[in-house]
Curated annotation (Swiss-Prot):
Transmembrane segments: 2-22, 45-65, 67-87, 99-119, 121-141, 154-174, 180-200, 225-245, 274-294
Name of this protein: Putative phosphate permease MJ0630
Subcellular location: Cell membrane
Alphabetically ordered keywords of this record: Cell membrane, Membrane, Phosphate transport, Transmembrane, Transmembrane helix, Transport
Amino acid sequence: MITIEISINLELIISFYLLFILGANNVANAIGTAYASRATTYRNLLILFSISVIIGSLFAKNVGSTVNSLSSDALTALIISALVMTLSTYKKVPISLHTVIICSLIGLNFNSSNLYVFGEILLSWILSPIIAVVIAYILYSAYEKIDISILKKITMIRYFLLISAAVVAFNLGSNDLPTVLGTFTTSQIIYIIGAIFLCLGAYLYGNRVSETLSMITNLSVSSAFIAQLSGGLAVTIFTALGMPVSTTQAIVGGILGVGLTKGIKTVRWKVLKNIIFWWVVAPIIALIIGFIINRMI
């Protein structure tokens, strides 16, 4: 009984820390494009983010129940993910929690893992940002050419951008949060506390990764909205195909797509190369650590 209680308390501490880091890193998914376009103040964006995350946590129980049935090696996977996410956040690089967790679990269960399925997932991780680039390029090119006054009203587009930011933040609370906490609890109170830790991470360190996204290319309110929309559409396409993909990678693809419409030189390739480098390295680190632990046991 004491062993179980200690294990749950340890999972709780690690989970809250991971959510804190998740907030610091993935807040950029929700408000990074709005921040880059100066749609409103960063303080207002953080308030919008926090409200949306906490509301999302109220709808997290179903996902938490599903994750709760798949809790094998959960504590070890959480520790590995916390380490890798901390490193990525320190490097100011947006990283997907799902890619890190999946790779850590592959490493921990290397002997029994279905590598064919992992290959399909890996392919979806590569293709999703590319699809987002294509969608964003097409949509923004079309937007620049159309002459419909209502679609050119910045105030209206700003509202759309803020709504899309709220939706992404809601999904962090309703989906990513229970991915972390659902391995050992489905308590609504714990989910709300977890949401507070997530918001705290965003408030204290979220500007680091958001600034990185804002450096990829210059964004207006309209291009920021199309980048966010394109990333969302790319994720929706792969979700419909049953493939887990990274919202982080898709949104970066969307930003790149709108940047390319203005010319290759408008994209800061050094920033983008650093992001892609860590997209490759971070999951590999998680996989290797998991594999080493697998061999030691």
